[in-house]
UniProtKB/Swiss-Prot annotation:
InterPro entries linked to this entry: Aminotrans_II_pyridoxalP_BS (IPR001917), Aminotransferase_I/II_large (IPR004839), HisP_aminotrans (IPR005861), HistidinolP_aminotransfase (IPR050106), PyrdxlP-dep_Trfase (IPR015424), PyrdxlP-dep_Trfase_major (IPR015421), PyrdxlP-dep_Trfase_small (IPR015422)
E.C. number(s) listed in UniProt: 2.6.1.9
The keyword Cell membrane is assigned to this record: no
N6-(pyridoxal phosphate)lysine, modified sites: 211
Protein name: Histidinol-phosphate aminotransferase 1
Record organism: Nostoc sp. (strain PCC 7120 / SAG 25.82 / UTEX 2576)
Pfam families given in the database record: Aminotran_1_2 (PF00155)
Length: 353
């Protein structure tokens, strides 16, 4: 076949998401960090209230209704909010707007692998700087890299640790480029870096409704940053990038904080119990402030356990890459799902003895 693609696209690898079985398949799905509980009843009611006029017309181009809801929730002005078709779109917008040919896009590893994919799409240079141990951010090296864009996920994936606020503040103060703080999992954490946005014009904070709000299928996220920074991002975003239904449902979801907080509390309690039970099975379990656990199984058999669990219709995440090949990432499910997983692991470990 004739090669129709740009050289950077031809050379890049595709992003590999967690396995998504067809709807209705009977599996225990603990591989994509989805919330095990349903969306807010208010969000579901908003879907039923959609009328034909909403679908006939183009949506409001900036998601104004949702921007106002975020403004009220976080206590920031409305013009400090940008809305995207999932938080991944906002990551892509930042790279399109800010990555320069003469300066690298920089981030610590291991982290969210989509940063590499999105950067390669734009043919920008990449500098990956290893974490020291699993949770010690290489602050000085990140600053010395002089990146046009620096990505920091906090809580990080796949580790689940929160980056200390002092480290983020130092980066915000000393980086000459844009600092993107990806808070996709912040609903399950004890702290946020939101205050840095108001103090530093080069910082954008990015969040999603996929995790804490159980709306991964909706595809809606948002960023918070200085209006001067956002105005540059608006220049390169797609027109009508967020559909009207998504905005209405998302607005209903984030105004129902009581429901979200109750679901998050259940996930956090289950996270604690699951970590304890995995340790009793001989797993090394890293401290997590996300809705998943990074684990190292006994006997160095991560890939074996992943494959055997898959045959039992239990999906978890295995990353065949340096530093992670002996580890498994497990999404926190309901207590019932977690117990089924634990029993399957007990059986598999006993069969290997």
């Amino acid at each position: 076949m004739t090669n129709y693609f740009r050289s950077n696209v031809e050379a890049m690898a595709s992003y590999v998401p967690g396995e998504q079985p067809p709807q209705g398949t009977q599996v225990i799905k603990l591989n994509s960090n989805e919330n095990p509980y349903p969306p807010s009843p208010e969000a579901l009611a908003a879907i039923k209230d959609i009328d034909g006029e909403c679908l006939r017309r183009y949506p409001e181009p900036f998601g104004e209704e949702f921007r106002k809801a975020v403004s009220q929730l976080l206590g920031v002005p409305c013009n400090w909010v940008i809305v995207g078709n999932g938080s991944d779109e906002i990551l892509s917008i930042v790279i399109r707007a800010c990555a320069e040919p003469t300066r690298k896009v920089v981030y610590p590893v291991p982290t969210y692998v989509l940063y590499r994919t999105l950067t390669e799409m734009q043919a920008a240079d990449i500098l990956e700087i290893p974490y020291r141990e699993y949770n010690i951010l290489p602050v000085a090296d990140l600053i010395a890299a002089h990146g046009s864009v620096t990505f920091i996920a906090s809580p990080n994936s796949p580790s689940g640790h929160v980056v200390p606020s002092d480290d983020l503040r130092k980066l915000a103060s000393e980086l000459s480029g844009v600092l993107v703080i990806d808070e996709a999992y912040v609903d399950f954490a004890e702290e946020s870096a939101l205050n840095l946005v108001q103090d530093h014009e080069n910082v954008i904070l990015i969040r999603t409704l996929s995790k804490g709000y159980s709306l991964a299928g909706l595809r809606l996220g948002f960023g918070v940053g200085n209006p001067q920074l956002l105005n540059g991002l608006f220049k390169v975003k797609d027109s009508y990038n967020v559909d009207a239904i998504a905005c209405k449902v998302a607005t209903a979801a984030i105004t129902d904080q009581a429901y979200k907080n109750a679901c998050v509390a259940k996930v956090k309690a289950s996270r604690t119990r699951l970590a304890k039970d995995l340790k009793q099975l001989g797993f090394c379990v890293w401290d997590s402030q996300a809705n998943f656990l990074l684990t190292q199984p006994p006997q160095g058999n991560a890939e074996y356990l992943y494959q055997q669990l898959r045959e039992k219709k239990i999906l978890i995440r295995y990353f065949k890459q340096p530093g992670l090949e002996d580890k498994l990432r497990i999404t926190v499910g309901t207590d019932e799902q977690n117990q089924i997983l634990l029993q399957a692991l007990r059986d598999l470990l006993e069969s290997r003895d």
